Design a protein with these regions (language model features):
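Terminal amphipathic alpha-helical/low-complexity segments used for targeting or macromolecular assembly
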Residues: 1-133, 252-260
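Acidic, carboxylate-rich catalytic segments that either coordinate divalent cations
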Residues: 230, 239-258
């Protein structure tokens, strides 16, 4: 909890500084961060502003999101861990405001977390609406039923696809163009399970009801059709094991070199 408060305090402080440094964005920083008393309020406001429109009120969405966050504080904690993941792993992220306001991967993941909550409340149409809006805004498609862990970094996000029965563990890094897809029209569990600390590089496709083991790395452009053990690197089409990792958390280093 103390760390969560610390991240919110830093986010708020940085927003004040950035608003002073760039007056044209001052209202933007105030509306989405500075005017709020806590992270949940800021997050609900920011997401609702992006996802609302002529037919769906942003204010109504904001109230709904606040209600969900109040009932499921784990979503708030996951969002904070995601923001920390960007700050620690992405060299282009030099403050917390960057992912919160400007990184579409962060927007897509937090929107899916709320859509996931709605999905489990049998509000499937609204969850699908959020999925649709995120697809239009962020050029990625994440099913509301997909299960996502915490501490996720989705870099760039363009072209990302995560299917309905996919499961993604904690502290995972996904780069642009990644697909966690099915391998046919089977019903039931048909998408991959991604273990903790996994890094999946740009353009990689992981297909079917298979598991990518903890702390593994998938090389860029690979097509993974079979289960991957823990702590290995796989690459190629179809992907094969090309090495064993001494780095147990490749998702943190974001090293796409498959030779080590």
């Amino acid at each position: 909890m103390n760390n969560s408060l610390s991240i919110w305090t830093k986010l708020h402080h940085q927003a004040v500084e950035l608003a002073q440094a760039e007056p044209m964005l001052s209202s933007h920083y105030h509306q989405h961060i500075i005017n709020h008393d806590d992270f949940a309020s800021a997050l609900a406001c920011h997401l609702a502003a992006q996802l609302g429109g002529e037919s769906v009120s942003s204010l109504a969405l904001e109230r709904l999101f606040l209600s969900i966050l109040g009932e499921q504080p784990n979503i708030i904690e996951s969002a904070l861990q995601d923001m920390e993941a960007y700050y620690q792993r992405d060299p282009a992220c030099d403050n917390y405001c960057r992912p919160f306001l400007f990184f579409k991967g962060f927007l897509a993941i937090q929107s899916q977390r709320l859509a996931h909550a709605l999905w489990h409340r049998e509000r499937h149409s609204l969850a699908r609406y959020i999925q649709h809006k995120v697809s239009l805004l962020c050029c990625c498609d994440i099913h509301p039923a997909a299960q996502l862990g915490s501490g996720l970094m989705v870099d760039h996000a363009t072209g990302l696809v995560i299917g309905e029965t996919a499961e993604v563990g904690n502290n995972v890094s996904l780069l642009h163009g990644v697909t966690l897809g099915g391998s046919g029209n089977d019903v039931g569990k048909r998408h991959p399970t991604i273990g903790d600390d996994v890094m999946i590089s740009a353009g990689a496709k992981v297909l079917g009801n298979i598991t990518v083991g903890k702390g593994s790395k998938v090389g860029a452009g690979s097509v993974v059709l079979n289960a991957v053990p823990a702590h290995v690197t796989v690459a190629g089409v179809p992907a094969k094991i090309v090495g064993r990792l001494s780095d147990k958390t490749p998702s943190l280093s974001i090293d796409q070199d498959i030779s080590h």
